[in-house]
Amino acid sequence: FSGWDKTLFGFVENATIKNVRLENAVVTGASKIATLALEVRGNSLIENCHATGDVNAVADVGGYAGGLITYLTSGQVINCSANVTTLGMRYIGGLIGLVRIDGVVRDCSASGGAHCVEYDAGGLVGTNSGLIENSHASGRVSRAYYSNAYYDCGGFVGDNSGIIRNCSAKGDVHMYGQNGGGFVGWNKGHIESSYCLGDVHDETDGYGGSASAFCGMNGRDAEGTVYPTNVPGTLINCFATGKTDIRNELNLTGYPA
């Protein structure tokens, strides 16, 4: 199906969805799209739901996409997976585009890959402010060249200000611009007992990019000031085994973990 804000279910609020399998789904359109749900909120539970297919949300307006869910505002997503190639402008995740502070993701996986034109692309989640545990991503993550905004691209999550524990990323990251990492592009939260295996390729011409095997930028903005104020990101018991291949060596940052 295609159009604006397209998913199988639209807004899921204080509801339970279990044991749904979507095979070879093809979703195209503008604004916010995914295979299963547009937004999950309230005391909702999404459990044992799985999807395969393609999602394409490239548009000047919106362009947010998730392999299974676009927004997890609150509630839980447990034991779900997506083998969906996900393409969009911003907030692009192989499983979920954006997880807000009251969202919980456990025992989930994504393998289809996530590709953005502007910012915040991750193999599992594009942007995370909630809690993610025991979850894994194995798809390739990439960000195309874009003249206005280009940052935060990670093998597991693009931008993190939440909590991530016991997670892994295995796909390569190909990027232009700032904050590319094998696991996380920009970390302003807490990441513990997690690892990544993929290589990071930074194609940025000239100074201005930042790339590293695990975390592209940890708790600091491009000017080096702490963000949020006096609350740097934390990395505990994390490691990376991949290589970092950069066009300009000035863009290599110091968070290989």
Region spans (language model):
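Predominantly extracellular beta-rich ligand-binding scaffolds that present long acidic/polar faces
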Residues: F1-A257
